[in-house]
């Protein structure tokens, strides 16, 4: 589909190269260290930090006592339909990958009480923060997963998710670490399997290199269509978007996020 860029019609692949320099390598210096320890687990390929600041007493208590009640166990088959994870069953299911402090996930869960949400986050401090919000606001439509989101995608039944959100993921700027980025051909295919027809994958990132990377992977995926029709569609947040703490930090530091929406065909 052609859209307008600088007053002339361009195809989506051409536009993505114009806007995000898809064919150019990332400009981050190779000696830039990533903040945190690198870990792997299970049969997947998760890389990232597991724990940062020491947990406060109440946070530790939530991890020990509340998390087991909300945590998904993927060593047994997923329920079908997936909506029966909740009692009573919800109407739709959504997934947020790497929810950080949980600001966006909490806001979405409160705004859509008839939708069930799965939040995947291996970072213990982020898990403790969202557990505190869940407890304080008595939120009943969130389940949590502390492992590799690619394993979770393989676990859910095909066509069971109405939407997947990936908001300000770790960009892994060094070229030798690009294979650690969540968006890969294999995970794009896994998301396509998990999403219902006309479901959406939404991606927010303030690093143009990773935005370009994501566009390149999604534009070559036959099961997805980029929904942008004009520049503001990726330059501005979608309606009712909840800015995360990391998003506000990026704005303070002068980095503008891009907001991408892809439809599962």
Curated annotation (Swiss-Prot):
Annotated family: Belongs to the class I-like SAM-binding methyltransferase superfamily. TrmB family.
GO molecular function: tRNA (guanine(46)-N7)-methyltransferase activity
Catalytic activity as recorded in UniProt: guanosine(46) in tRNA + S-adenosyl-L-methionine = N(7)-methylguanosine(46) in tRNA + S-adenosyl-L-homocysteine
Species whose genome carries this gene: Rhodopseudomonas palustris (strain ATCC BAA-98 / CGA009)
Chain's gene name: trmB
Gene Ontology CC, one term: tRNA methyltransferase complex
The protein's name: tRNA (guanine-N(7)-)-methyltransferase
Positions of disulphide bridges: none
InterPro entries listed in its UniProt record: SAM-dependent_MTases_sf, tRNA_(Gua-N-7)_MeTrfase_Trmb, tRNA_methyltr_TrmB_bact
Recorded metabolic or biological pathway in which this protein acts: tRNA modification; N(7)-methylguanine-tRNA biosynthesis
UniProt keyword annotations, A-Z: Methyltransferase, S-adenosyl-L-methionine, Transferase, tRNA processing
Residues spanning the signal sequence: none
Enzyme active site: 170
EC number: 2.1.1.33
Function summary: Catalyzes the formation of N(7)-methylguanine at position 46 (m7G46) in tRNA.
Binding-site positions, S-adenosyl-L-methionine: 96, 121, 148, 170
Residues binding substrate, per UniProt: 174, 206
Domain of life the protein comes from: Bacteria
EC top class named in words: transferase
Bilayer-crossing regions: none
PROSITE patterns documented for this protein: SAM_MT_TRMB
